[in-house]
């Protein structure tokens, strides 16, 4: 497993990091986002949407109550929030339907089991309110794609 780390000093940095990763994403990529409330998971997904050329990326919101939102871009984006769900409920969302045609971003992913082709995104906040964003990638070839993208604002 390869780890790629980023530091975000403000929300716009988190969006930019997500955008860079979105530019290198392909249909079937699954991002499992973990972090406390307010850590920046939804800001990261806004960036993914921007990188996937979703026209209304600024309007991406956490699907806390709808549970699953989809967006059209050069590649579709399926945004899921599992905060309010228990394990058995997750299978009923139909996330598998999007795995061939979209990038899937799952907030509160620690609440379920997942597929092999996943990237874990952990966001932690330090005392200075900086976000440490760690992308864990199983496939070394995929890790190279994101390492080669310049994510410096």
Q: Residue locations for each model-derived region?
A:
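N-terminal pre-Walker A segment at the start of P-loop NTPase domains
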Residues: 1-20
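Short phosphate-coordinating micro-motif centered on Lys-Gly-acidic
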Residues: 4, 88, 96-153
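Phosphate-binding P-loop
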Residues: 22-27
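Hydrophobic anchor at the beta1->P-loop junction of P-loop NTPases
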Residues: 31-33
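P-loop (Walker A) phosphate-binding loop of NTP-binding proteins
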Residues: 36
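Conserved lysine of the Walker
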Residues: 41
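Post-Walker A helix-loop "phosphate-sensing" segment adjacent to the P-loop in P-loop NTPases
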Residues: 50-59, 73
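Conserved nucleotide-sensing/catalytic segment adjacent to the nucleotide-binding pocket
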Residues: 60, 64, 68-110
């Amino acid at each position: 497993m390869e780890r790629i780390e980023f530091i975000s000093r403000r929300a716009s940095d988190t969006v930019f990091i997500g955008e860079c990763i979105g530019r290198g994403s392909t249909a079937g990529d699954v991002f499992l986002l973990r972090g406390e409330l307010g850590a920046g998971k939804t800001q990261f997904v806004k960036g993914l949407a921007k990188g996937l050329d979703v026209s209304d990326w600024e309007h991406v919101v956490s699907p806390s109550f709808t549970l699953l939102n989809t967006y059209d871009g050069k590649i579709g984006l399926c945004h899921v929030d599992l905060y309010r769900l228990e394990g058995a409920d997750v299978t009923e969302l139909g996330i598998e339907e999007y795995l061939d045609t979209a990038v899937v971003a799952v907030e509160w992913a620690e609440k379920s089991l997942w597929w092999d082709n996943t990237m874990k995104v952990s966001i932690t906040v330090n005392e200075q309110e900086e976000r440490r964003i760690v992308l864990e990638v199983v496939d070394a070839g995929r890790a190279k794609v994101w390492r080669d993208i310049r994510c410096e604002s």
